[in-house]
């Protein structure tokens, strides 16, 4: 990989790490008070039962604790990414996000690119591999003339379904225009939602990602703006 690209991505990773760390905040059942475990009556709700309130049980307490997060970065390397050097901004974003996540003790990152040679996608880094040992697979090349976004996203969903993380998130890095694919974006979104998996987009030099609502992605016109857009992703979309 180009040394300048790597160094810029490494520098960017330092500026986005603190924002990504917020994603480790996971809603978990509180375990502080023994008497709150299981089903118990709520005194305040019991009083209201005379007025017709039927739910008189105490809700399980919830708190935000640091949990293990599985993050899959799915990057578009189709031919259209060569326009306006989008692929360079995409790989810098991919690497920066990967290295930032890797620096956090409870975040685990895997990377997928699509399309890849004769396949619709390729897993270039698994959760148990480091960025450094997978670096040779982070290619700048544009590998295909079609964009099987749905299939690549479904692979990411399946990867997370096979994991035991407390929170599961997918970042799609793309110029936003899927085509030939076994699965539609809608099908993937529905499966992800049913299984508690969050999917957000990082649009590279585009104000539209087909299949994504406007409040589920950010636009990166230049990687110098990546830290600003990651902050939006974390605090406005994934909060």
Question: Locations of the language-model features?
Answer:
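Short secondary-structure boundary/capping segments
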Residues: 88-90, 125-129, 185-189, 213-218
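Phosphate/oxyanion-binding active-site loops and adjacent basic polyanion-contact surfaces
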Residues: 86-90, 144-153, 226-230
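Von Willebrand factor type A / integrin I
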Residues: 153-169, 180, 187-239
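Acidic/polar low-complexity segments with low predicted structural confidence
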Residues: 1-71
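Short, solvent-exposed loop/turn segments at secondary-structure junctions
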Residues: 81, 179-180
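Von Willebrand factor
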Residues: 62-167, 169-173, 201-209
């Amino acid at each position: 990989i180009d040394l300048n690209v790597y160094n810029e991505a490494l520098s960017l990773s330092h500026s986005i790490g603190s924002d990504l760390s917020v994603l480790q905040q996971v809603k978990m059942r509180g375990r502080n008070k023994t008497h709150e475990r299981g089903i118990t009556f709520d005194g305040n709700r019991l009083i209201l039962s005379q007025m017709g309130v039927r739910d008189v049980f105490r809700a399980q307490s919830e708190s935000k604790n640091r949990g293990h997060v599985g993050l899959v970065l799915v990057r578009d390397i189709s031919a259209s990414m060569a326009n306006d050097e989008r692929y360079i901004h995409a790989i810098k974003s991919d690497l920066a996000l990967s290295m930032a996540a890797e620096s956090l003790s409870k975040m685990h990152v895997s990377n997928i690119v699509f399309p890849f040679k004769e396949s619709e996608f390729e897993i270039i880094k698994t959760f148990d591999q480091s960025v450094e040992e997978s670096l040779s697979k982070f290619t700048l090349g544009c590998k295909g003339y079609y964009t099987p976004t749905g299939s690549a996203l479904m692979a990411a969903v399946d990867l997370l379904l096979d994991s035991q993380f407390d929170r599961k998130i997918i970042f799609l890095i793309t110029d936003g225009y899927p085509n030939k694919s076994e699965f539609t974006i809608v099908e993937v979104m529905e499966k992800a939602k049913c299984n508690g998996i969050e999917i957000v987009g990082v649009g590279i030099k585009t104000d539209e990602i087909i299949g994504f609502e406007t409040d589920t992605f950010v636009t990166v016109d230049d990687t110098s703006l990546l830290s600003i857009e990651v902050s939006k992703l974390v605090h406005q979309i994934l909060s």
